[in-house]
Amino acid sequence: MKNEFTEILENIETALRKSLPEKTNPEWQAGTFRNLSDCVTDEHIQNLIKPCRNLMDLGGKRWRPLLLVLCSELCREAGKNSPLSLEQTYSITPLVEFVHTASLIHDDIEDSAETRRGKPAAHISFGLDTALNAGSWLYFVAPETIDTLKTTVEFKNWLYALYTQELRRLHLGQAMDIYWHRNPNLFPSVNEYTQMVHLKTGTAIPKQTWKLLLCG
């Protein structure tokens, strides 16, 4: 199955690296930070990029952005109208993958986990303060892909509203998880636990987005 999706996954990696490059350039800096003083160097910015880029480079199945692209392709094969071209769909894959990456960085901090994907967790490698700040920053980098979309203002506003709503749901799911960790004598019901998993995991794959891409 991996070989079947090789080209799609390569295109996804290209989109992710464009939004979060290992080395910055003036165009990316302007799009991400707008005007910066000359005293701000790439070394300063790397304190944000490296913890995030390092975790992404350790692997991950990329099934969230893969599903996003596959749904977009299904829409076209079914002859349905979609507000996004395939190229635009690739360009917004950071919306789901960056949220996932940021949540892993924060989750490892909150769980006091020492490893992630077989390597030291971000807060172990880079320090808690740097990892926490970088993870938070990545949540705000993702919607930059909405800013650059060539589409209607109404559709952009819809995407922004969807994105922020899903972030709120993600943090509610994490709050439920932390609550049970801090109260080991409390046992969640099946429905409660299922809801927590849905909020945390399902948030990175907004159902509304699939509906939009499939139904136009």
Model-derived regions: residue spans:
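Hydrophobic alpha-helical core bundles mediating ligand binding, dimerization, or RNAP-core interactions
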Residues: 13-16, 20, 52, 138-139, ...
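Divalent-cation-assisted or electrostatically stabilized phosphate/pyrophosphate-binding catalytic cores
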Residues: 116-138, 186-201
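Well-ordered alpha-helical segments within folded domains of soluble proteins
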Residues: 63-69, 135-144, 203-210
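Conserved N-terminal diphosphate/IPP-binding helix and adjacent helical/loop segment
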Residues: 1-99, 105, 109-124, 175-188
